[in-house]
Amino acid sequence: MQVLVRDNNVDQALKALKKKMQREGIFREMKLRGHYEKPSEKRAREKAEAIRRARKLARKKMQREGLLPMKPKPVVGVR
């Protein structure tokens, strides 16, 4: 992965690198590979993730159909 440093602005380059790594899922991968995960634990984690995704999808569908109230959007920039 490569990030350009412009005008010796290393902070901005680091921020861009972190953003790229986050998008690629590198941090999550590092966290998962940080220690050995037993196959049974891996199956349980993946099953829980699938259930979470299905619930989220169902919730969004219910909101679109008007059966659940929409989540209020946060107000940005009001002081």
From Swiss-Prot:
Record family assignment: Belongs to the bacterial ribosomal protein bS21 family.
GO molecular function: structural constituent of ribosome
The keyword Translocase is assigned to this record: no
Keywords attached to this entry: Ribonucleoprotein, Ribosomal protein
GO biological process: translation
PANTHER family in alphabetical order: MITOCHONDRIAL 28S RIBOSOMAL PROTEIN S21, SMALL RIBOSOMAL SUBUNIT PROTEIN BS21M
Transmembrane segments: none
One cellular component term from this protein's GO annotations in UniProt: ribosome
InterPro entries named among the record's database cross-references: Ribosomal_bS21 (IPR001911), Ribosomal_bS21_CS (IPR018278), Ribosomal_bS21_sf (IPR038380)
Lineage: superkingdom: Bacteria
Protein name from the UniProt record: Small ribosomal subunit protein bS21
Region (Disordered): 59-79
